[in-house]
Amino acid sequence: AAITLSPETSAQLRTFAQGHHVTLNTLVQGAWALLLSRYSRESEVLFGTTVSGRSADIPGIERMVGLFINTLPLRVRVAPDAVLSEWLRALLERNSELRQFEQTPLVQIQSWSDVPRGQAFFESLIVFDNHPLDESLEKATGLTIQGVTLQGQTNYPLTLNVLPGKELTLSLWYHRNRFRDETAARMVRQLETLLRAIIQNPRARLGLLPLLASAERAQVVGAWNRTGRAYPADMLANLRV
């Protein structure tokens, strides 16, 4: 399941992030935390986030070839009365605190927690691709690459892959033995709805941010509740139930 935001909406998200001194990654993490909280009905959620691993204090690390990425757990409290803009800044600070563990294996981090070994630490992951393929190649060679499709797989039931650029793309990879196709598609649409709500209501309370788009809300509230029927005037009341 995937969705590509329009250039206008993508630009608005970048402008919002810059204006509120957060990152685009923070906005996506915030929307994902809100979505997980609504689905689980929990005030605290835990999901994985990938880090580059290249901010470590190692001489010459920026010139080293190979993968340094690591996956770290991000625990987020979603208080319904929290102010969105302040909550996002706190989320950014939480990400900054995680940097000290960039080189720490996830299995070691789990050993420090109350989650037993062998039990899933978390069941969803966000992968934010800071270096889109086409932009990197264009800068290096002057060539434009089009029609590229990326496919990936992780061991987590849900993986949100975020591809920034002129048009922000959100791709949700999921295990079909856990989630139906229509459920994954709905989650991606609701994620877009939350992102749009974030840039429109920076001072909103978290609990008031909409999960349904206008058309979906109209269907649920209006169309699905049109259950009125005409009954004969002389019918007994107990027969109308």
Spans of features found by a protein language model:
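Adenylate-forming
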Residues: 1-185, 192-200, 208-214, 222-227, ...
